[in-house]
A protein has these predicted regions:
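SDR active-site lid
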Residues: 183-219
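Conserved glycine-rich cofactor-binding loop
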Residues: 29-30
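A glycine-rich helix->loop->beta "capping" turn
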Residues: 84-95, 103
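The beta1-alpha1 cofactor-binding region of Rossmann-like NAD(H)/NADP(H)-dependent oxidoreductases
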Residues: 70-80, 112
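Residue(s) in the substrate-gating loop at a strand-loop-helix junction
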Residues: 150
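Substrate-binding pocket helix/loop in short-chain dehydrogenase/reductase
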Residues: 106-107, 114-116
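Active-site helix of classical SDR
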Residues: 130, 166
Length: 219
């Protein structure tokens, strides 16, 4: 599945460009974000990777990338990351919104605090980052925004209602954004991975252990 995702970047087209692209990827400490960062660096692009897991993200500095401390729920973190990239590179060509969490439990069982945090990361964190990047892409007259959604942005299954809702919301939001920014030469792409064994899967299982394993929904 990871290979298919990376190949989809080839299909988007920016990788084959003669000029290296300046790319910001969120959630690069593990999983899809880490594999994507390595892949794009191998292709000669300039890659900044943001993650809340600062120490686990430092590998980027050793392979030619730039690691950033970036919690997408923190406006200051987002603003500082974008400001640094613009100061150092003068532009941002590609934004890959990959950071996300999965609350894997029954809708009734999950606290509203965790339900809202699900949306804070998976939707509003993306919105926060996109809003910070768009003025620069509009000034450039070009840019690509890639939102990592999920097959569950189109489908659904039990014990994941809040996650499914956040991805369905992201899909509709991305479709509207695409229509709004097309006039500025900016494209918006949605990638919908299937099940991949990454840290987000492990985290989802922990939420299940916390909430639904011993509830009426887990029996």
């Amino acid at each position: 599945m990871l290979k298919k995702i990376l190949l989809s970047f080839l299909m988007i087209g920016f990788i084959s460009a003669n000029t290296p692209k300046v790319v910001l990827i969120t959630g690069t400490a593990h999983g899809i974000g880490k594999s994507t960062a390595k892949y794009l660096l191998d292709k000669g692009h300039i890659v900044y990777g943001g993650d809340i897991l600062v120490n686990e993200n430092l590998y980027l500095n050793d392979i030619g990338g730039i690691a950033l401390e970036m919690d997408v729920t923190n406006q200051e973190h987002v603003d500082n990351a974008i400001s640094r990239i613009i100061a150092e590179q003068g532009r941002i060509d590609v934004l890959v919104n990959n950071a996300g969490i999965a609350v894997g439990s029954a809708i009734e069982d999950v606290s509203m605090e965790d339900a809202m945090y699900q949306f804070e990361v998976n939707l509003f964190g993306i919105g926060r980052t996109v809003k910070a990047v768009l003025p620069h892409m509009r000034a450039q007259g070009s840019g690509t925004i890639i939102n990592i959604s999920s097959v569950l942005g189109k489908a659904y299954n039990p014990l994941g209602g809040w996650y499914v809702a956040s991805k369905h919301a992201l899909e509709g939001w991305s479709d509207v954004l695409r229509l709004e920014v097309k006039q500025f030469g900016i494209d918006v792409v949605i990638i919908e991975p299937g099940l991949i064994k990454t840290n987000i899967s492990n985290a989802s299982a922990k939420y299940y252990q916390k909430y639904s394993k011993n509830s009426e929904y887990g029996n």
